[in-house]
Amino acid sequence: MRFDAEVILNAEQSKTAHLLLQGLIDGARLAGVRVTVSERYSGAAPWLMLWGVGREAPLIAREQHLAAGGRVIHWDMGYIGRGKIDAHCRVCIDHDHPWRLFERTRPDPARWETFGLDLREDASPDGHIVVACLGRKSVKMLGLEGWEDRAIKRLRQRFPGADIVRREKPTSRHVSVPPIEDVIRGARLVVCRHSNCAIDAAIAGVPFECEDGAAYWLAQRDFTPDNRLDFLRRLCWWQWRHDEAPLAWEFIKEMLCD
């Protein structure tokens, strides 16, 4: 079976994105995918590979390609192991977040176990509530101006007297924001729209509420240790280092062709 993908690679992307994308392109070719590299979307292949969830240009290209009957592989920085050059990159298909395909994702523990993380129980039933703020690009792209204020208003009605902490989204490596682990430790609840904070909460054992994002799959289930672990095992199949790209593409082909 022949696999063809168009990849958008241009000067609008960061140096880090270029390096990671090149590794993903090389991995695609090693996995038997015929890759066409374009500066602008052309619809040259049945599959389209993009970098940057929540950015305007990739979103427009994705919508055009889906409308034409194609499939879209969309990459961004990872969920766990979020670094730069040695980072894991998260992948989703046709959407911003992969939770719709979690039922088809094997809960094999192998990838999760490579992180050496244990589930924690950091929640306190009488603790504070954390509201994870949106970043500027999400506010703009999704039309969510004031989302945090509305969320806090609802929470004050539900939990009179509770301490509510706004956790601003880090906008730059030069801006100091307390580590999310410290912010949610001792919390009773984390509330976000689609933030990775929900994944941190799943690891930490702090209940969370979200409207979208990878953790939405878990949000629809009981917040038990077994379900948390099941979620994290599935999640880790949706993120890869660029040096794992051939394996990533075998997984992507399985999800696209099954």
Predicted feature residues:
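Phosphate/adenylate-binding glycine loop and adjacent helical scaffold
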Residues: 62, 76, 82-90
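N-terminal pre-catalytic "stem/leader" segment of glycosyltransferase-like enzymes
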Residues: 1-47
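Donor nucleotide-activated moiety binding/catalytic core segment of transferases
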Residues: 37-40, 156, 160-209, 213-214
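Short, well-ordered secondary-structure micro-motifs within conserved domains or adaptor modules
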Residues: 38-66, 187-193
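Conserved catalytic-core segment of nucleotide-activated headgroup transferases in glycan assembly
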Residues: 122-173
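Short loop/turn segments at strand-loop or loop-helix junctions that form parts
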Residues: 4-10, 75-79, 126-138, 167-169, ...
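Leloir-type glycosyltransferase catalytic cores
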Residues: 84-127, 217-258
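A short helix->loop->beta-strand "cap" motif at the edges of active sites that frequently abuts
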Residues: 67-71, 205-206
